[in-house]
Structure formats: structure tokens, C-alpha cells
Amino acid sequence: MTELKAKGPRAPHVAGGPPSPEVGSPLLXRPAAGPFQGSQTSDTLPEVPAIPISLDGLLFPRPCQGQDPLDEKTQDQQSLTDVEGAYSRAEATRGTGGSSSRPPEKDSGLLDSVLDTLLAPSGPGQSQPSPPACEVTSSWCLFGPELPEDPPAAPATQRVLSPLMSRSGGKAGDSSGTAAAHKVLPRGLSPSRQLLLPASGSPHWSGVPVKPSPQPTAVEVEEEDGSESEDSAGPLLKGNPRALGGAAAGGGAAAVPPGAAAGGVALVPKEDSRFSAPRVALVEQDAPMAPGRSPLATTTMDFIHVPIRPLNHALLAARTRHLLEEESYDGGAGAASAFAPPRSSPSASSTPVAVGDFPDCAYPPDADPKDDAYPLYGDFQPPALKIKEEEEGAEASARSPRSYLVAGANPAAFPDFPLGPPPPLPPRAPPSRPGEAAVTAAPASASVSSSSSSGSTLECILYKAEGAPPQQGPFAPPPCKAPGAGGCLLPRDGLPSTSASAAXAGAAPALYPALGLNGLPQLGYQAAVLKEGLQQVYPPYLNYLRPDSEASQSPQYSFESLPQKICLICGDEASGCHYGVLTCGSCKVFFKRAMEGQHNYLCAGRNDCIVDKIRRKNCPACRLRKCCQAGMVLGGRKFKKFNKVRVMRALDAVALPQPVGIPNESQALSQRFTFSPGQDIQFFPPLINLLVSIEPDVIYAGHDNSKPDTSSSLLTSLNQLGERQLLSVVKWSKSLPGFRNLHIDDQITLIQYSWMSLMVFGLGWRSYKHVSGQMLYFAPDLILNEQRMKESSFYSLCLTMWQIPQEFVKLQVSQEEFLCMKVLLLLNTIPLEGLRSQTQFEEMRSSYIRELIKAIGLRQKGVVSSSQRFYQLTKLLDNLHDLVKQLHLYCLNTFIQSRALSVEFPEMMSEVIAAQLPKILAGMVKPLLFHKK
């Protein structure tokens, strides 16, 4: 086979004369102890006499004995086609060579002997033979400095040699076959490519079976524009680099791409002549040097071989900082390897690299990724929109305890995220810059899609944390140091996908969404997100952010501009108190016609239309609803029964902020219109006054007291009284404010469920007011004392009903409290499935509960006493459920046996009993209790 040759000179040599292959042999240093140095020992060291050293022989190589120098064109062709065979032949001849077996020729043999003596190990038995002179054809730094198996055995004198007198990465026997070596300055691999050098345990010479290394090694191949070597090595040089991690780790079973040796050698694109500016590694000079490394390797490795494609300087800066700050790369790893980094190092975990910045084959993806202590490290973050502070904050924060803040920020600006242990490792994400494909292995992609904790960590890296000041200008926000996703402000809608399908699709979506003020999305981005964000950022100013329709609406009137008399319906000037409410003439006529005409108005909106002086005619349904809520009833004409002076003073009390002094006889009425600073000012008469005005008149039973009482006559008289009271309940409920807003079916249902409770409650109130609870005052013509109760057939039932007036006497219930409790009894039982107008029903019930509290406050002073009073009254309402159930059962039994008992039941009462009492007794209704039993 032909031998690997270097190309023509790119710069004039330093010898001062034309290069000639016959000048001499270069000074070859003693190779660093190989991985199998212990297998071959030598008891004695060769004695070499002093020889003169030729400078030309030191700097320029020459061909082997008996070999003619080749022309430059032939050398270029052989250098490309024999990359695989060069390293294999060098390994095949190692077992036959020795330190003194080379035939001396001119200065070459003597110089090699001198170097063998100078660079011999210090301990006995550590001498190692060198390969034959003419077999190793590589004049390049193919594998970098070799690490000896025993680091202390490395020669100490090797570090003091001049960089030009030592071969940083060549083998020890490279004395011939390198005629063109003087044309190219020997150089080592860049620090970023040292990560993939073969381990120290891998074979280097022949005689040992070659094993594929877990990571492919990198071979630099020079490419010259217009050279004829493109025909044979075109795919290796012009094509995109390929990751060989999967093939190399497979034990050699997988197919190896062209240009890769059995040991996993991968081709690395050579630097272009247009980019020759070196980049010096300043920190590596102070870092401890790995055992077996030469000073030349440290110097030449600082030159970064820039590819032809345009570079992203931000990513290069981040990568350089990574390589310079990690001293573990050059510190040595003992018998393991100094160039294959341990699993816990950042270099072993952060393998993916963007195409166009570094060759992909130099950073193959890890086939078996594992978590380590460097979570936020690597090249998985896109370098777009980054600055120096962000680079430090996103990468160095995970490697060192230092915290990198935004320029001008202090630690107090990040109170929510104290420095702590690094968050869990996010999986490697594919590069997201436009025009770049994701270069990841299948196992790595699978680990990305199966990781559930990656979303939270990647999210905190890409998005600004809540509480952190936003980055101004076109820069991206600083990374979030929160351990979880809960600490970030923006939602997950715009998060990029980290699944394997997204990696195979190509470019990922933009990782930095457009941000507006304080990190919020722009106005045209997402309205829902903006609204949610404003609630967190601008809570005191949300009232100012109203739609245009609401912004134009102002209060109808203020307290300062309140006229003496205004309409409580539309806000116009009031003409007087009509139907119990201070209204204008227009609303008065509207309410009268609506109630008398029995119109069924329907709102076209949501029953929340605005009713004012201008828009009061737009929606009659909402206008009528507002009239009923204000308390307008047709029975409001009963206000005429009051003294005219008293009514006028009541109206003045509504219009003026301070109550007007009135005579003592109207002190109770004045309390209803007296306002205190802690109470809500109401611009309409209290609801209690309306309840007083609609209270039914006295109803007579029509019982003939001249005849002796019989069971049938007494029960028949009570049924006739019940019929009349039922009609009175229907009329009263229709005049009740808010009751007409319910569905007509709900109105009927409530009356049928509560008519018995209302009648027995009214019985107790009349007994309490007229006879102080000593008798049962059914009607003025039907009053049962205890003697008549005993003579009746329902004495036990009379004793049950007698408990109510006795409770009234005990609690001294006022009329206002009784009226509010009576309304609550109407709203105290509903069907199990609920009402059709359930929402309106609950609002109505809540309003009357508040009225009961106000009625209690008229007499009780203090919060404690008012609370106790409210508990006592509501407890009485709850106890009525059990009492009324006994009445229902007796009434149903009497109705069933009416013919046998000769008891008459009126028509309406019969319908209600037959339709509803079986359901009530069967438990098909839901009683609304204030307290749990």
C-alpha cells in the first residue's frame, strides 16, 4: 500500500533553504508510554555515544532507506487513500521493533538512540521498543498525545524540550516515509476534539487485537481546492460530517462509514487557509498538564480549526468558556483515560453540537445518556439573542456556585430563587436555528421524548421568572433558576416541543417569544394570556381597563349631585311615591299598564340591560324587573292610609342625608329611614315597609258560634277558613317584591309546598298579638281556648300548633321580624330537582335573609346580641318543618276519610291536598334548613 503523505508547504520553512527530502531525518521524541508498556521490558538501557545534531535533520523529515521521494501530486493522492492503512500497519509492526534494533543511517539512527536514552523511563524495566522506522507513515498528529498507563512513569525531561523539537501527536517511529512532513507544522487536536481520543487501554501497535473504542477518534484530513483527491475522498471531505457514536459503540458490528478505521477513526474537516487566526487558551496554561503530554501539544491545541461555514461567535464563546473553565479535562484520569472524560463530566453529557459551528463527528451523541451533576450545560441551548451575562448565567451557574446576574441587577432582585443545588438534568434538545438539522442518535431522542421532568427545567431556562426584572432591548430574558415550572410567569402555550417527532421534523419553533411590557405577550399575541397576566402585574389598576362600552358609562348620579326627589327606576326627577316607590310619572304609568295588562316581557339580552332616562324604553322586561326589585306593587296605594305629613317626612328622609326630626308618635317609622355611616344608603323605602303594606286583611271563618261544636262542623269551618287563607296567600305572594320574577311554575310550586306553613305561622302570630298566646286565634269568629281544644277531635294537633304562639311570647318577636320570617317560609321548601329559576330564587331568598338581619338590628344593639337573635329566629323556622309535617299527615288522612267523617273540603284546597301532600310526605321535596340537625 501507499503511504500517507502530507501536502505541499503553505508557508516558507524556517530552515533557511529549499526543502529536500534527502537533508535528514527529523528528531523523533521517545513516544509516551503506550497502554501495553508493562508487557515488554528491558533490563539494560542502551549506551549511545555523543553525536553532532544537525538543525536540518531536526526540522525536516526525509524518506526511508531505499525509497524514492514522491512528487507532490502522488503524495496528495496517497495521503487520502491510505488513511485507514497507515494506522493499521503502524500497529502491525510494533512487536518486531526494539529500542536498539534500528540500523543506524546517517544522523537518524544516532539521534533516535540519543532520544531513547534521554527519554527512557526512570525506573528499571520500563524501557519500551519503538516501531520500525519506515513503517509508521503518519506525519500528522493523528491521535494527540498518548497517555501512559502509569502516569508517574512519564519522562520528566519531555516537558523541557522545545516545542519545535517534539512531535506532539506522532508515533515514536516516524523517522521515514514522511518526506513532506516539513511542509506542514505538526499540530495537535483542538481542546474540543481531545474529548474523543481513544482511551489509554486501546491498542496502538500490532500484536494486539484491535477493539473498537466506545467513542470514535478524530482524524484531520487536509483538503485543497481543486485537488484531484476529490474523486476518491469526496464523500469524506465535502459531505456533511456524520455521527459515528452508534456504530462505534456497537462493538464493530455496525457498518463503519468510509474513512473510519476499525478503531472508530472519524474524519474531521480541516481548517481553511482563509481562517488562520489562532485562539490561545489562557486558562489551559495554568491548568495541570496531563501525564504524557508535551508542551507542543498544549501550544498547538490552542488553534481552533475554524470550518468554512460562518460561525456563531456567541456559541463559540460559550464553548470556549466551557473548555477553559473545566480543569478536569487536562488533570488526567489515572488508568482510565485522560482524553475520554468520565461519565459525570460535562463533556460526556453535552455531546450534541450545531452543524456549522463544530463537526458533528467530533461530538457524537451518547448512546446511553445518563444524568449527571451538570444539568444546564452543553450546546442544547440556541445561541440566538444571547449576551455575555446570559451565557454565564445559563451555563456557569450549573458548574460553579457563582451566580451570574443581569448587568445592573443585584441579588435582591431575585428574591424568589435562592441559589441551591442544580435542578434535574434536562434532555438534550435538537438545535433550533433555521437551516440546521438535528444531529442526535436514536437512543438520545427516545430519552428526550420519555422524560417528563424536562419540560419544567427547559421552561425555566427559556422563559423569564416571575419577579425577575425583564431584559430590555432585543435580548432574551435571563434564565429562570426556579426548581420547577411553578415559578415562571408565562404559560406553557408557547413552549417548544421536546418530543422525538419534533427532532425529526427539523427546525423547532422559536424558543424566545415576542415579549411586551414586563415580560407579558404583545397585545396582539394572546388576549386571554394578557388578561391573566394583568391580574398578576396590575391588580390595583384593573378597574381602569374597561371596554369602550363600559368606559362610557358613568354613575347615574352621585351623592353630591343628588336631587331632592329622583326616580329609583330610571333616575329621572320623581313626581311622587307611586305604588310604594318614589318614581317618575313615566315609570308609574309603565308599571300600572304592565301589571294590569299581564304582559309577558322577555329580555333580548341577559336580563342586565341598563335602565336610565334615555334607555328606559329599550327593554321593558328589564324595566319591569327593576320596578319589582325596587318594591313597586299595585297594593302600594295603602300608603294613603298613613298620615300625609308622615309620608312627606319619610320622603324627605330619603332625599336628605340627615334624618329630619319628627314627632314621637312616628319614632318607629323614623328608625326605618335613619341612616348610619356604617350602613348602605338605600334610596328607596325599606322592604319591611312594603311587607307591612301588603299584609292581608283580617279573614273570617264563618263559623256559627251559636250552635254547639261538633267534630264535623268544626273541621268544616277550619277548611273554609283554609280556603280563604289560601286565596289570600296567592294574592300576597303575587304582591311580594321579587316573587313575580320567578317562573310561573316555580311560583305555583312554592305556594303549594308552603301554604300550610304560612297558615299555621299566621295562626301563631294572631294568637300572640291578640290573646298573648293564651288561645288559638284562628279567626275573629273562631277562637279556641283550652277547653274547646279538649272537646275537639284534634286536641293533640291543637297542642302542636299552640307551641308557635308560645315561642313568639318567649322570643317577643316584632312585626318586622315576623314579616321577614313569613317570606322565608314561602321560600323554605323546593323540589329535589330544584326550580327553573333557581338563580333568581336564591337571590330573592338571600335578600330577605338580609332584611331579617336588618329587622333584628332595629331592636338589638351589638353584634353578639344580633347574632344570638338571628340564631333563635332561624332555629324556630327550622323547627316548623317537623310541626307542619304532622299537620300534613292529619290533613291528608282527614281528606281521605272526608265522606266518612262528613267533612267538607273546598275545591282549591282539595286540589292542593291531592296533588302535593303525597309528595311532601314521601320526602320528594327538599327543605331548606338554616342549621344542621
Curated annotation (Swiss-Prot):
Species lineage: Eukaryota, Metazoa, Chordata, Craniata, Vertebrata
Organism: Chlorocebus aethiops (Green monkey)
Cross-link (Glycyl lysine isopeptide (Lys-Gly) (interchain with G-Cter in SUMO)): 388, 531
Sequence motif LXXL motif 2, location on chain: 115-119
SMART domains reported in the protein's UniProt record: HOLI, ZnF_C4
Gene3D superfamilies registered for this protein in UniProt: Erythroid Transcription Factor GATA-1, subunit A, Retinoid X Receptor
Record-given protein name: Progesterone receptor
Principal location class: nucleus
Annotated stretches, region: Modulating, Pro-Rich: 1-566
Residue ranges of the region described as AF3: 1-164
Keywords linked to the UniProt accession: Cytoplasm, DNA-binding, Isopeptide bond, Lipid-binding, Lipoprotein, Metal-binding, Nucleus, Palmitate, Phosphoprotein, Receptor, Steroid-binding, Transcription, Transcription regulation, Ubl conjugation, Zinc, Zinc-finger
Chain ranges passing through the membrane: none
Comment block on domains: Composed of three domains: a modulating N-terminal domain, a DNA-binding domain and a C-terminal ligand-binding domain.
InterPro entries from the UniProt entry: NHR-like_dom_sf, Nucl_hrmn_rcpt_lig-bd, Nuclear_hormone_rcpt_NR3, Nuclear_hrmn_rcpt, Progest_rcpt, Znf_hrmn_rcpt, Znf_NHR/GATA
Residue ranges of domain NR LBD in the record: 679-913
ZnF region ranges: NR C4-type: 567-587, 603-627
Crosslink position(s): Glycyl lysine isopeptide (Lys-Gly) (interchain with G-Cter in ubiquitin): 388
Motif (Nuclear localization signal): 183-187
SUPFAM superfamilies reported in the protein's UniProt record: Glucocorticoid receptor-like (DNA-binding domain), Nuclear receptor ligand-binding domain
Source taxon at top rank: Eukaryota
Location of region: AF2: 687-933
Gene name of the encoded protein: PGR
Subunit: Interacts with SMARD1 and UNC45A. Interacts with CUEDC2; the interaction promotes ubiquitination, decreases sumoylation, and represses transcriptional activity. Interacts with PIAS3; the interaction promotes sumoylation of PR in a hormone-dependent manner, inhibits DNA-binding, and alters nuclear export. Interacts with SP1; the interaction requires ligand-induced phosphorylation on Ser-345 by ERK1/2-MAPK. Interacts with PRMT2. Interacts with NCOA2 and NCOA1. Interacts with KLF9. Interacts with GTF2B.
UniProt-annotated location(s): Nucleus; Cytoplasm
Region Mediates transcriptional transrepression: start-end pairs: 165-305
Region of interest (AF1), residue spans: 456-546
DNA bind region: 567-639
